[in-house]
């Protein structure tokens, strides 16, 4: 599901004053200290939904947003649980941590005001995608692998510094061995575009998703 915001909008990810070097005085006056205002869309923000059923039903949502804080995820899980009849404890909400999403959290110190209308739009998308996935469940075989990746990412834009190079890959295939979906777990601070970027984007993980 595409979860692009209505533009223009405030951007989360580089709201500390030390990240304001790219903004003019006029931009700072319009958007507030440290908060960028998105002037366009570089690529789509997505909501990915995976439902696994083996005796019990587990739902995994991954959002292209900066932070999935508890206040937000609790509201989303409750909405999906009530709409789909699912156990709220079996609903997981995570994020890709792009630093170029709309403001969806209250910030590290409660200094931000999240876009509550955007929250509601995401909840509606979650409900729709969960209902669709429940109607289209397929038999699948699961394999779990771990690989080492070098040269494609690290922790922020710091080449040569230590980082976790392990990636776990959960692959679901049909009985004929055809791939259905892959779920990747890796440690990466996706800040490739940096604070100078004024476009909404999924950043590194958007490119990774399109390439896998």
Which role does the model predict for each range below?
Residues 1-94, 102-212:
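Conserved beta-alpha junction segments in alpha/beta enzyme cores
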């Amino acid at each position: 599901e595409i979860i692009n915001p209505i533009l223009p909008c405030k951007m989360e990810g580089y709201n500390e004053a030390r990240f304001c070097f790219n903004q003019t005085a006029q931009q700072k006056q319009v958007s507030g200290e440290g908060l960028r205002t998105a002037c366009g869309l570089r690529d789509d923000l997505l909501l990915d939904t995976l439902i696994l059923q083996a005796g019990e039903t587990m739902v995994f949502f991954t959002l292209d947003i900066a932070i999935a804080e508890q206040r937000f995820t609790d509201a989303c899980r409750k909405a999906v649980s009530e709409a789909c009849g699912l156990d709220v404890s079996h609903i997981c909400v995570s994020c890709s941590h792009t630093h170029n999403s709309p403001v969806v959290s209250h910030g590290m110190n409660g200094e931000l005001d999240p876009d509550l209308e955007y929250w509601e739009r995401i909840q509606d998308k979650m409900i729709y995608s969960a209902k669709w996935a429940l109607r289209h469940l397929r038999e699948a075989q699961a394999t779990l692998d771990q690989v080492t990746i070098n040269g494609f990412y690290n922790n922020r834009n710091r080449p040569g510094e230590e980082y976790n190079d392990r990636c776990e890959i959960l692959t679901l295939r049909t009985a004929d061995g055809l791939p259905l979906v892959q779920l990747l777990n890796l440690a990466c601070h996706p800040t490739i575009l940096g604070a100078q970027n004024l476009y909404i984007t999924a950043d590194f993980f958007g490119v990774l998703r399109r390439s896998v």
